[in-house]
Design a protein with these regions (language model features):
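Active-site-proximal beta-strand elements of phosphoester/diester hydrolases
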Residues: 1-6, 115-125, 167, 233-240
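Active-site environment of divalent metal-dependent phosphoester hydrolases
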Residues: 5-7, 38-41, 62-73, 126-129, ...
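Extended active-site neighborhood of metal-dependent phosphoesterases/phosphodiesterases
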Residues: 47-159
């Protein structure tokens, strides 16, 4: 979560830290896991939040959180705003729930074939069913899309699942289960209960069945900064900027 506010001194300082990290790490790709902006005007805040990455010529991708579309621009409008920015790899699947659902294949060193996959999901914003409170969840059609795409990649790879990671904003309910189990080992800092949705639509189970995703990376909970292995999949947080 960058939570960029245009013309905010705090955001400018955060931008300096982001620049330091980018210069030190020199990543091949940056993925923003939602709540990129938190101030109006939305377009200016978004451009400023992405600028340190764009300035360095580093490819990037964005998925949206629950706050991004609360600042005067819809998810689709934000997607259209960033789609032609230099280095942007964010994509969308027409007809699928949400906006920022896409797959980034990682090629083998010789560029001959896909060697790994990065699955990015739109985890939406808030609960939309009567009687259900809290945050939104990845919908059934998104889970089915993942199942179908994962199967295609596995079949194309001779029946062997391609190593994959997944990125979205709101943590899965399994983040709760993992930390409540005495047999798990948590690395990092946990200062609050994961603000996961009350509805579990089975994405974690689908990932286990597919056998490709080794790690899930989310944001959303600002004072959580940890990784925990649950049933063979690492459940991780990205640090709040």
């Amino acid at each position: 979560d960058v939570h960029w506010k245009a013309d905010s001194i705090a955001s400018e300082k955060a931008g300096e830290r982001m620049s330091e990290v980018l210069d030190a790490e020199k990543p091949d790709l940056v993925i923003f896991t939602g709540d990129v902006i938190f101030g109006k005007p939305a377009d200016k805040s978004m451009r400023c939040a992405l600028e340190p990455t764009i300035k360095r010529g580093i490819p990037f991708a964005v998925t949206f959180g629950n706050h991004d579309d609360e600042l005067g621009m819809s998810r689709k409008e934000l997607y259209d705003f960033i789609k032609d920015m230099p280095g942007n790899l964010t994509s969308t699947v027409e007809g699928l729930s949400g906006v920022t659902n896409f797959i980034l294949p990682v090629k083998a060193s010789d560029g001959s074939q896909d060697a790994a996959l990065l699955y990015v999901f739109d985890s939406h914003s808030y609960a939309t069913l009567k009687g259900i409170k809290g945050y939104g969840w990845i919908k059934h059609d998104q889970v089915q899309w993942y199942i179908d795409e994962s199967k295609k990649f596995t079949e194309a790879n001779g029946g062997i699942p391609l190593t994959a990671l997944s990125f979205f904003h709101i943590p899965l309910p399994e983040y709760h289960e993992a930390v409540q189990n005495e047999g798990t080992f948590l690395i990092g800092t946990r200062k609050e209960k994961a603000c996961a949705p009350e509805i579990n639509t089975g994405l974690f189970a689908a990932m286990k069945e597919a056998g490709d995703v080794l790690g899930v990376f989310v944001g959303h909970d600002h004072v959580n900064d940890y990784a925990v292995s649950w049933k063979g999949i690492m459940l991780c947080y990205g640090r709040f900027t």
